[in-house]
Amino acid sequence: MTTLAIDIGGTKLAAALIGADGQIRDRRELPTPASQTPEALRDALSALVSPLQAHAQRVAIASTGIIRDGSLLALNPHNLGGLLHFPLVKTLEQLTNLPTIAINDAQAAAWAEYQALEGDITDMVFITVSTGVGGGVVSGGKLLTGPGGLAGHIGHTLADPHGPVCGCGRTGCVEAIASGRGIAAAAQGELAGADARTIFTRAGQGDEQAQQLIHLSARTLARLIADIKATTDCQCVVVGGSVGLAEGYLALVEMYLAQEPAAFHVDLLAAHYRHDAGLLGAALLAQGEKL
C-alpha cells in the first residue's frame, strides 16, 4: 500500500509517495503560504497533493505544532495566526478522499529514527535542535503522543529560571537557549544580528564569543538529556537538526554529558535521516501504528 506523506513546516510544504518498502518517490515541495490563512494553506496543499493522490491509498501528515483531534494547535497560539484549529485531517480527507492521519513532525521523525536503529532497542528519545528544539519519545516500542498531542515537546522544559522568555510563553526553556534561534538571540557586539550558521562559522574561525554561545547550547542540551535519562531510562538518545548535526556539536554535548553523574549517562547517536524523517515517520506510522 502506498502512502501520500505530507510534511508541513514553517517555511516549506513537502509531499511524497512512500511505498511499503519505505522508499520515497516523486517528492514535491512548495513554500508555506506567508499569509497564515486557512484558505491559503488549503490551496497550497491542494496544489501539492493533486498530482500524487491518485497513486496513494492513504494520507499521513507530519506537521509543526500540536496535533489534537486532527486539528492544528500550538504552545503559543500566536505563532499560528489564522491557522489555529486548522482541520488538517478533515481538509486532506476532503481533498483526496483518502483515509488520513496526522502527527507532530518531531514525533514522526522520532518514529523514523527509531525504526532505523540497530539492535534490541525498545526505549529511545529523539531530539531535534534546529530553529527550535523538539523531540519524540519511544517507550516500550511505542511512540508516545499523549492524549493532547503534547508528548515529546522537550524543548519547553526548564533550563534556566532566569533565562530568556521563550516563544511558548515560559521563561528559560531549553529551546530559548539551545536552539539556533536562541544562539542567535544571545549574540552581542559584532555578532549581534548574526544567525546560527554564521555563529558556527565564526566559532570554527576561533571567535571566542561564538564558541561560548555554542558551548552554552551544548551544555544546556546535555543537561536536558540527563533529565530525559532520569525520566525515561531510555537506552539511547538520537540527535538531529541543523544545529544538532553541525560539525563538532554532538561531541560537545557528549563532553558535557560525561560531566554528569554516571547514572545519567546514555548513548548519543547522530540522526540517520538528515532530511524527510517527518515524511517517512508519518508513513511508517500509517502502516500500522494506532495514533
Swiss-Prot record:
Keywords: ATP-binding, Carbohydrate metabolism, Kinase, Metal-binding, Nucleotide-binding, Transferase, Zinc. It catalyses: an N-acyl-D-mannosamine + ATP = an N-acyl-D-mannosamine 6-phosphate + ADP + H(+). Its EC number is 2.7.1.60. It holds the Pfam family ROK. GO terms for molecular function: ATP binding; N-acylmannosamine kinase activity; zinc ion binding. Catalyzes the phosphorylation of N-acetylmannosamine (ManNAc) to ManNAc-6-P. HAMAP family: ManNAc_kinase. This is N-acetylmannosamine kinase. It comes from Escherichia coli (strain 55989 / EAEC). The lineage of its organism: Bacteria, Pseudomonadati, Pseudomonadota, Gammaproteobacteria, Enterobacterales.
